[in-house]
C-alpha cells in the first residue's frame, strides 16, 4: 500500500515542502533563518490576535487599552511584551536571512529574491503601522513625520498625505485605518511567504559552495527538521529572555507618555530596526531626495541580481568581495547608530559618508570587484 503521505492531495503538498524535499547536504546554520521567520510570523499573528481582542482603535482609549492589557488581562503583559520583542527578533532574522542571500549569491534565484524584497517591504510597513497603535508620544510623532514624507511627491503629495491621514492631521481616522492595515497585512505576508517558498522549491536551495548540488541531496526530514529545531530553541529562548527580563530594553521611554499633538519629543526616531533607513533619509538635506534615498535603500536589493558580474555564485571563494560584504555589514551598523543620534555635527557628516558608502558598495564596488576577480582568474 502506498503511503498516504505521498498520495493524499493535501498531505502530499506538505510532504513535498517539508518532509521529502531534496535539500543540499552541506547547507549551514545560515539556511535556518527562513524557517525561523515562519516561526516568528506565527508567533506575531497569535500574540497579535490576542492583543486585538482587548485593544481599542480609538484615540481616546487606545493608550489606556494597552495599559489595561498589561495590568488587568490574564498574562496580558506577557502577550504584549512577546509581540513587541517578537518584532525585534523578526527583523534580526530578516536581516540575517537577507545577508545570507547576499553572501552566498542566493539572489540569482531571481523570482524568489524579488518576492523576498516585496516581503521585506510588507513587513516594514506592517511594523510601522503597528508602532502607531499604542498611541504614545513616539507613536504619534513617528506617524506624523513618516507619513508627512509623502508630501514630497510632486503635484499629488499633499492630497496623498491627507488621504492617508483621513483628515488634516494624524487623528482618529488614521489610527483606525492603521489598525485595519496592521491586522490585515500579516495574512498578506503569509500568502506571499507561500509564493516565496513555491518559487524556491522550483529551483531548490542554494548551498555554501554555490555549485550545483543535484548529485548530493538528502531529505529535509529528519536531517534539517531536527537541525532547524536547534535554531527554534535558541530564538525562542532569546525571545523569552528579552520578554521576561528586559521587556522595555528595545522600546522608547517616550512611548510611556500618551500622545500629545502640542508637545514634540526632543528626538523623534523609529524603532531600532528602521534606524539605518532613517539615517539615510536624514543624510540628504532635500525632502524629496531624502524620500527617494529612503525607498532606494531597500529597492537597491532588486538590482543586486542584475549587477552580479562574477563568474562565481557566492563569496565563499572570493576574499576581496568578502571584505566588501563585511564593510557593508559594518556600514549598516554605523547607519543604525547614527539614526539614533541627534541631527548635529559630527553625526550628520558620518551619516552622509555612511550613506554614500552604502549605495557605492551595492552599485559600484561589489560589481567592479566581481569583474576584476574574473580578470585576475582569466575568466573572460
Curated annotation (Swiss-Prot):
Localization in the cell: Mitochondrion inner membrane
Highest classification ranks of the organism: Eukaryota, Metazoa, Chordata, Craniata, Vertebrata
Residues at which heme b b562 binds: 83, 182
Binding-site positions, heme b b566: 97, 196
Topology within the bilayer: Multi-pass membrane protein
Alphabetic keyword roster: Electron transport, Heme, Iron, Membrane, Metal-binding, Mitochondrion, Mitochondrion inner membrane, Respiratory chain, Transmembrane, Transmembrane helix, Transport, Ubiquinone
Transmembrane segments: 33-53, 77-98, 113-133, 178-198, 226-246, 288-308, 320-340, 347-367
Protein name, as recorded: Cytochrome b
Taxonomic source organism: Latimeria chalumnae (Coelacanth)
Amino acid at each position: 500500500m502506498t503511503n498516504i503521505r505521498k498520495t493524499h492531495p493535501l498531505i502530499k503538498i506538505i510532504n513535498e515542502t517539508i518532509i521529502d524535499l531534496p535539500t543540499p547536504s552541506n547547507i549551514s546554520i545560515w539556511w535556518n533563518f527562513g524557517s525561523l521567520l515562519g516561526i516568528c510570523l506565527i508567533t506575531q499573528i497569535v500574540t497579535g490576535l490576542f492583543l486585538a481582542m482587548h485593544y481599542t482603535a480609538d484615540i481616546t482609549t487606545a493608550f489606556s487599552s494597552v495599559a489595561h492589557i498589561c495590568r488587568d488581562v490574564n498574562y496580558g503583559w506577557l502577550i504584549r511584551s512577546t509581540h513587541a520583542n517578537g518584532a525585534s527578533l523578526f527583523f534580526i532574522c530578516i536581516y540575517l536571512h537577507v545577508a545570507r542571500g547576499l553572501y552566498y549569491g542566493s539572489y540569482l534565484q531571481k523570482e524568489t529574491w524579488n518576492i523576498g524584497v516585496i516581503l521585506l517591504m510588507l513587513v516594514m510597513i506592517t511594523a510601522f503601522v503597528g508602532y502607531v497603535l499604542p498611541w504614545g508620544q513616539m507613536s504619534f510623532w513617528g506617524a506624523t513625520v513618516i507619513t508627512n514624507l509623502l508630501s514630497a511627491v510632486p503635484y499629488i503629495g499633499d492630497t496623498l498625505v491627507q488621504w492617508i491621514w483621513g483628515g488634516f492631521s494624524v487623528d482618529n481616522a488614521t489610527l483606525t485605518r492603521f489598525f485595519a492595515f496592521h491586522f490585515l497585512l500579516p495574512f498578506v505576508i503569509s500568502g506571499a511567504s507561500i509564493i516565496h517558498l513555491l518559487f524556491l522549491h522550483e529551483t531548490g536551495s542554494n548551498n555554501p559552495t554555490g555549485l550545483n548540488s543535484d548529485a548530493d541531496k538528502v531529505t529535509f526530514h529528519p536531517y534539517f527538521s531536527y537541525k532547524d529545531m536547534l535554531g527554534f530553541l535558541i530564538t525562542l529562548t532569546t525571545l523569552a529572555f528579552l520578554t521576561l527580563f528586559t521587556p522595555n530594553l528595545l522600546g522608547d521611554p517616550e512611548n510611556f507618555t500618551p500622545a500629545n499633538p502640542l508637545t514634540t519629543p526632543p528626538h523623534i526616531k523609529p524603532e531600532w530596526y528602521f534606524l539605518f533607513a532613517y539615517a539615510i533619509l536624514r543624510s540628504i538635506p532635500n525632502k524629496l531626495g531624502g524620500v527617494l534615498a529612503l525607498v532606494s535603500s531597500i529597492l537597491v536589493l532588486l538590482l543586486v541580481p542584475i549587477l552580479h558580474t562574477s563568474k562565481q555564485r557566492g563569496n565563499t571563494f572570493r576574499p576581496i568581495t568578502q571584505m566588501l560584504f563585511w564593510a557593508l555589514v559594518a556600514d549598516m551598523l554605523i547607519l543604525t547608530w547614527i539614526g539614533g543620534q541627534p541631527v548635529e555635527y559630527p553625526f550628520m557628516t558620518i551619516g552622509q559618508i555612511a550613506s554614500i558608502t552604502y549605495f557605492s558598495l551595492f552599485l559600484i564596488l561589489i560589481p567592479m570587484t566581481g569583474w576584476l576577480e574574473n580578470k585576475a582568474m582569466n575568466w573572460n
